[in-house]
């Protein structure tokens, strides 16, 4: 992943107006893991990317910074 993914993931959550804890619960991960994704510490697998796209209503290309 790249820095654009982390930034976009964080911005989408903020635009939705939810906390990391709430978003993490909806996405089936811990708040700490979501924080790591948003800060570029860890890289998610494909299942998380798909869930995040569904949750935020965006395409994978958008989430991954390809558009």
Task: Indicate residue ranges for each PLM-predicted region.
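A short, Lys/Arg-rich alpha-helix, primarily the initiator
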Residues: 1-15
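Residues that mark the N-terminal boundary/hinge immediately upstream of a DNA-recognition element
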Residues: 8, 19, 45-48, 59
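Alpha-helical residues within the helix-turn-helix
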Residues: 14, 25, 54
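Short alpha-helical DNA-recognition segment
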Residues: 17-39
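DNA major-groove recognition helix of helix-turn-helix/homeodomain DNA-binding modules
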Residues: 28, 47-62
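DNA major-groove recognition helix of helix-turn-helix
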Residues: 38, 48, 67
């Amino acid at each position: 992943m790249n820095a654009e993914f982390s930034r976009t993931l964080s911005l989408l959550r903020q635009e939705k107006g939810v906390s990391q804890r709430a978003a993490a619960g909806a996405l089936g991960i811990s708040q700490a893991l979501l924080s790591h994704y948003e800060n570029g510490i860890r890289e998610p697998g494909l299942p998380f990317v798909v869930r995040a796209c569904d949750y935020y209503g965006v395409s994978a290309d958008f989430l991954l910074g390809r558009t």
